[in-house]
């Protein structure tokens, strides 16, 4: 999942950079630059949160920030409610987005 996200991120940034070169108005350029900034900020935050989760003992975690929620997938052999609460707290503190967290455990 992380490799797929990295590939999509790279493709999206490349596409937006091409659009930026072709943009004719300053308003259009500003809109594209804002979109690039939004994508980069979310990507950096996803990676930071995954690193924090690894530090808390969840090295196999995937975080995806969406417009209306944050999806988290954690590979864990023995999930329980306490682990879920701890993971959600870490994600909420790290992202500081105020978005609901959708947590899924996989074994």
Predicted features and spans:
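Bacterial N-terminal Sec-type targeting sequences
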Residues: 1-96, 100-107
């Amino acid at each position: 999942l992380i490799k797929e996200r990295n590939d999509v991120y790279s493709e999206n940034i490349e596409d937006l950079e091409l659009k930026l070169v072709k943009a004719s108005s300053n308003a259009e350029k500003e809109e594209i630059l804002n979109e690039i900034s939004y994508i980069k900020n979310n990507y950096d935050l996803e990676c930071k949160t995954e690193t924090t989760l690894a530090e808390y003992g969840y090295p196999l975690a995937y975080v995806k920030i969406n417009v209306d929620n944050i999806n988290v997938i954690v590979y864990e052999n023995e999930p329980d409610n306490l682990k879920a609460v701890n993971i959600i707290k870490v994600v909420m503190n790290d992202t500081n987005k105020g978005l609901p967290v959708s947590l899924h455990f996989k074994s």
